[in-house]
Swiss-Prot record:
Gene name linked to the record: guaA
Record-given protein name: GMP synthase [glutamine-hydrolyzing]
Domain GMPS ATP-PPase: 207-404
GO cellular component terms given for this protein: cytosol
Domain Glutamine amidotransferase type-1: 4-206
Catalytic activity: XMP + L-glutamine + ATP + H2O = GMP + L-glutamate + AMP + diphosphate + 2 H(+)
Record lineage: Bacteria, Pseudomonadati, Pseudomonadota, Betaproteobacteria, Burkholderiales
Active site, per annotation: 85 (nucleophile), 180, 182
GO MF terms held by the record: ATP binding; GMP synthase activity
Matching InterPro entries: Class_I_gatase-like, GATASE, GMP_synth_C, GMP_synth_GATase, GMP_synthase, GMPS_ATP_PPase_dom, NAD/GMP_synthase, Rossmann-like_a/b/a_fold
Species in which this protein is naturally found: Albidiferax ferrireducens (strain ATCC BAA-621 / DSM 15236 / T118)
Binding site residues for ATP: 234-240
Amino acid sequence: MHQKILILDFGSQVTQLIARRIREAHVFCEVHPCDVTDDWVRAYARDGKLKGVILSGSHASVYEETTDKAPPAVFELGVPVLGICYGMQTMAHQLGGIVTSGHQREFGPADVRAHGHTALLEGIQDYKTAAGHGMLQVWMSHGDKVTELPHGFKLMASTDSCPIAGMADETRRFYGVQFHPEVTHTKRGAAILERFVLDICGARADWIMGDYISEAVEQIRAQVGTDEVILGLSGGVDSSVAAALIHRAIGEQLTCVFVDHGLLRLNEGDLVMEMFVGKLHAKVIRVDAADQFLGQLAGVSDPEAKRKIIGREFVEVFKAEAAKLKSDQSRHVAWLAQGTIYPDVIESGGAKNKKAVVIKSHHNVGGLPELLGLKLLEPLRELFKDEVRELGVALGLPYHMVYRHPFPGPGLGVRILGEVKKDYADLLRRADAIFIDELHNFIDEASGKSWYDLTSQAFAVFLPVKSVGVMGDGRTYDYVVALRAVQTSDFMTADWAELPYALLKKVSSRIINEVRGINRVTYDVSSKPPATIEWE
């Protein structure tokens, strides 16, 4: 059994990034809600495998009576504790310090000065000042701040606007940082978390994906037993890896249902069948439901409404297919499997403690009501995208499948702004295919990689507005598409990709000349945050 780090989640949108960074250090960790009891904490630590505790951030204020605090037992276990942002504030508040509302909110990049040569920050820095002070470039997101240290703590870090940006009680191995080491904007954040879990906690670096496969296979077999499972197969990375993992566990007990809702990428239906039936030898039922989906989406322009309609129609299709399978007396279909991953859960406010603020609903999480009559199997629910890809490779899936850019469950339905129409989808399919084709074709000289491999996600978006153009001697009045390409390591934050002008020029020229009905191409230069990766 692995040694473990316990992460208590107070509802931050980026809590799961803490888990991701720790797993990158090959240390096993689990996320649990912050409102667990003292008895639960003591029982969790009873096997001697608990090596440390991390308290996450939150949008709440610790001095309000109704907000959650850490279970007091956390500070009595004798293991190291790290508080991040709100986690530091609740540590200070509960141990006798003072937390107050700041006069100004600190959100964004900041330069933090390290103090006191603590075990957590010793030797970790981005640069030194002329006076020789070690400085860290970090990401802040807070309004409240610690104004008085608890007894036994010393100052560990500060900024100009936050005099106590870090604190340490090295005797008890309690540490707090006001900034977020888990996000990529904190350049040395991974090193800080590695220092905590490996050096201060002394946890073994023995968490590898091969271990996850064996444990997940065992868990799936125990969950499912002799029941049969159906899985909604989209051809994307998540559902593909989920299918391969479940197939590894239960083989012929898995039936994949591939729904062609009329909102897939160009030729995707045929490619999915070739890949899964021809190469993986899985059982796949293909359902042509384009008319059903497009009919229900007619006249609907609200993004949330579209997502919910698509989710609802998936339920109807699955109910119909499940009924067919259940009618066979020799089979017992009891489970619906999904390729839900951590970012889906987080952005839907569906983290384990249900305290995260909802940004937008996700197709995988919110589209399946209990009336489906099937239990939910989500073997990738605790994994981030990079871990899912690593798992896919370990399962023997082809590289091009595993490293294909993610595609949303609602498909082009959330890449067509406003009302979804078949003509719009046909135009967008062709424009998107050209964009992806040229990303594969253009090679970056410095790295030797294609721009498809250098971007994390790229796609075209259909804008239901027309602009005036000129083709030959004639005037055109046609639609506009926007190109979107981002670079990210975790999909929680993302930067827009600085594609070469020559590439953008080629893509624009091809789309305008080859896709009749489009006469203008734009490029989206928004990062996440404040924008999301998808437009809807």
